[in-house]
């Protein structure tokens, strides 16, 4: 489908033409290169974190590298121990083509610092340097959740996700989004590959390398809170909200759109789009192109419920999408229907909350 306008103006020049389904903070391509048990001493004066993040500075004497887990995007991840606890250590890559993007990715990861939630990967410690690599933009130590992602669960050899599991996983992700948005953080790269599966079959949102913080005060003024950085150029194009493709300000509703694509993937077990990237992007913006709703979204009551949720969350206008609070309440209702138990959301109303109203 030819594009009558230059779609390139919506795209960062260094965006890969292929679908990037790989996260930075979860296991990817295994490397067979041996690692030393420890890290070399820092050379020169180490770069320090700002005072507000001094609490999480890495004590390098307590770091012991165990094995590489993988690499992708802006970082390489290792299994390690820190103060006797098994952790994931992410070393941000030094990019010769875009060093600014590498630094921005590191500082964006720290948007999750101090945050504690069952469905958000916890940042344990961080450093603006790395021993033996003075050019490294930074190092982040995170909780170790294991080696699985939601992407691997959807597209691997496991049986398809049943309705109950789909809704439970979706509820975990929505709960994590609600927490992040309440704290003023927008993830901006939500997709199955960035949702880690932890022990207890818990979903945890990870890889905050594209995240941004909302500006304070906008909500009180009656508008939707926007990010401090008005334009967004990162993330995965298949999950990027139409308003971001058009260069409009970033709001938390962009994560809701990405959630819709993610839930669609959980149900369908298919990739969102095929074909030329620029044609897809133009069609998403100009013609409201969305992934096709197959029979799985219409043959059962659960499928029809998922269809309603997905369609409300990927509405073209951000104002028509639910916020994370409304989304979680609706998913709680659906989980209760799947399990036959009472809903665990607020008992103020037994009816599903209206979707697409408010922030």
UniProtKB/Swiss-Prot annotation:
Cellular component per GO, a single term: cytoplasm
Protein kinase domain span: 63-336
Keyword Ribosomal protein: no
Parts forming coiled coils: none
Keywords: ATP-binding, Cytoplasm, Kinase, Nucleotide-binding, Proto-oncogene, Serine/threonine-protein kinase, Transferase
CDD domains: STKc_Mos (cd13979)
Source domain of life: Eukaryota
UniProt-annotated location(s): Cytoplasm
A Pfam family this chain is assigned to: Pkinase
PROSITE patterns noted in UniProt: PROTEIN_KINASE_ATP, PROTEIN_KINASE_DOM, PROTEIN_KINASE_ST
EC nos: 2.7.11.1
GO terms assigned for molecular function: ATP binding; MAP kinase kinase kinase activity; protein serine kinase activity; protein serine/threonine kinase activity
Matching SUPFAM superfamilies: Protein kinase-like (PK-like) (SSF56112)
Residue positions of the active site: 189 (proton acceptor)
An example Gene Ontology biological process: MAPK cascade
UniProt keyword Nucleotide-binding present: yes
Family the entry assigns: Belongs to the protein kinase superfamily. Ser/Thr protein kinase family.
The protein's name in its UniProt record: Serine/threonine-protein kinase mos
The organism's taxonomic lineage, starting at the top: Eukaryota, Metazoa, Chordata, Craniata, Vertebrata
């Amino acid at each position: 489908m030819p594009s009558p306008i230059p779609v390139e103006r919506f795209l960062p020049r260094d965006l890969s033409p292929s679908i990037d389904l790989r996260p930075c903070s979860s296991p990817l391509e295994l490397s067979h290169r041996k690692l030393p048990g420890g890290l070399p001493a820092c050379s020169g004066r180490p770069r320090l974190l700002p005072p507000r993040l001094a609490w999480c500075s890495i004590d390098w004497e307590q770091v012991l590298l165990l094995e590489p887990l993988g690499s992708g995007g802006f970082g390489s991840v290792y299994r390690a121990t820190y103060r006797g606890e098994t952790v994931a250590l992410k070393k941000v890559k030094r990019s010769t083509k875009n060093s600014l993007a590498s630094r921005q990715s590191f500082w964006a990861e720290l948007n999750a610092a101090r945050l504690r939630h069952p469905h958000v990967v916890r940042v344990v410690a961080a450093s603006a340097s790395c021993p033996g690599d003075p050019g490294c933009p930074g190092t982040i130590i995170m909780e170790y959740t294991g080696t699985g992602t939601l992407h691997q669960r959807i597209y691997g050899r496991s049986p398809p996700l049943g309705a109950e599991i789909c809704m439970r996983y979706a509820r975990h992700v929505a709960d994590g989004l609600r927490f992040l948005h309440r704290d003023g953080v927008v993830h901006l790269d939500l997709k199955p590959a960035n949702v880690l599966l932890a022990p207890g079959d818990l979903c945890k949102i990870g890889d905050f390398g594209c995240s941004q913080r909302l500006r304070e005060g906008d909500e009180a003024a009656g508008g939707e809170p926007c990010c401090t950085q008005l334009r967004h150029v990162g993330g995965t194009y298949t999950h990027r909200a139409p308003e971001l493709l058009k260069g409009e300000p970033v709001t938390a509703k962009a994560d809701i759109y990405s959630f819709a694509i993610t839930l669609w993937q959980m149900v369908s077990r298919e990739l969102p789009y095929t074909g030329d990237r620029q044609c897809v992007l133009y069609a998403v913006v100009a013609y409201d192109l969305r992934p096709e709703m197959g029979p799985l979204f219409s043959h059962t009551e659960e499928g029809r419920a998922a269809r309603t949720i997905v369609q409300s969350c990927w509405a073209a206008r951000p104002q028509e999408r639910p916020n994370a609070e409304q989304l979680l309440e609706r998913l709680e209702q659906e989980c209760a229907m799947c399990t036959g138990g009472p809903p665990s959301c607020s008992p103020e109303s037994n009816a599903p909350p209206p979707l697409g109203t408010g922030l």
